[in-house]
């Protein structure tokens, strides 16, 4: 029933309504005329992205400075998805690092983020705990994977059906050489570069599926720490990848 409405009653002020989040994905929106769709989208964007912008800016500047000034650590903000327009300026003002994920570009005209365009004050990563890993994402949407293979990696021909260790290493290397000050990758994405040590079952790599309340944080390493410490080829490969990216970072700073 809830998916058949465009507006939700306000729970504090009777007789007032606000646009329902994600209504554009449902039949009720698709059944509208183009004129009505445009009208709804204007209301939607105004309500969620502009109307409360000053309010959220004031709230942020009231609370965040106390947090950022109470520690010497670098502070990273999770600024993905549906956020007010003021977030970027607040983070820049307070020198909070943004989070950059290539498959979730912040530039609307991009299908994939451009690693060399990431802001220096940012954390670059391939996947988060709420997303599929690199290998899992590769197998989710073949057409999207094909476009990534051709445009982002610059390869010709048909993309492999699975993300091979060689492909994963290339993608990891690209991220390590991004413009971000930090590149922090998940354990699963690090292991993806080695065919011997990565999990044989790619579905077991994912940590959490936010849309599924039954999918809790049940990820477990499929190898022991003792095995990992003895994985000389894997450790050597990672040790070789990181200094190269560090050299790139130092060159950027100078």
Annotated model-derived regions:
Residues 1-244:
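Active-site and adjacent substrate-binding regions of carbohydrate-active enzymes
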Residues 247-254:
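Conserved small/polar residues in nucleotide/adenosyl-binding loops
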């Amino acid at each position: 029933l809830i998916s058949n409405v465009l507006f939700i009653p306000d729970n504090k002020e009777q007789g007032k309504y606000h646009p329902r989040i994600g209504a554009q994905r449902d039949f009720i929106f698709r059944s509208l005329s183009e004129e009505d769709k445009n009208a709804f989208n204007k209301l939607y964007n105004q309500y969620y992205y502009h109307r409360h912008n000053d309010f959220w800016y004031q709230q942020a500047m009231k609370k965040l400075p106390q947090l950022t000034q109470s520690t010497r650590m670098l502070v990273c903000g999770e600024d993905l998805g549906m956020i007010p327009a003021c977030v970027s300026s607040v983070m820049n003002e307070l020198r909070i690092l943004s989070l950059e994920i290539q498959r979730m570009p912040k530039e609307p005209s991009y299908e994939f983020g451009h690693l060399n365009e990431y802001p220096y004050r940012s954390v670059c990563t391939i996947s988060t705990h709420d997303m599929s890993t690199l290998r899992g994402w590769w197998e989710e949407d073949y057409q999207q994977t094909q476009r990534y293979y051709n445009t982002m990696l610059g390869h010709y021909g048909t993309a492999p059906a699975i993300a091979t260790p060689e492909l994963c290493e290339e993608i990891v290397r690209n991220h390590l050489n991004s413009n971000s000050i930090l590149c922090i990758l998940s354990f699963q994405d690090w292991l993806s570069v080695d065919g011997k040590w990565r999990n044989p079952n790619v579905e077991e790599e994912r940590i959490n599926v936010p849309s599924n309340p039954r999918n809790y944080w049940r990820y477990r390493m499929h190898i022991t720490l003792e095995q990992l410490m003895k994985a000389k080829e894997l450790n050597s490969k990672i040790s070789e990848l990181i200094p190269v990216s560090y050299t790139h970072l130092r060159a950027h700073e100078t």
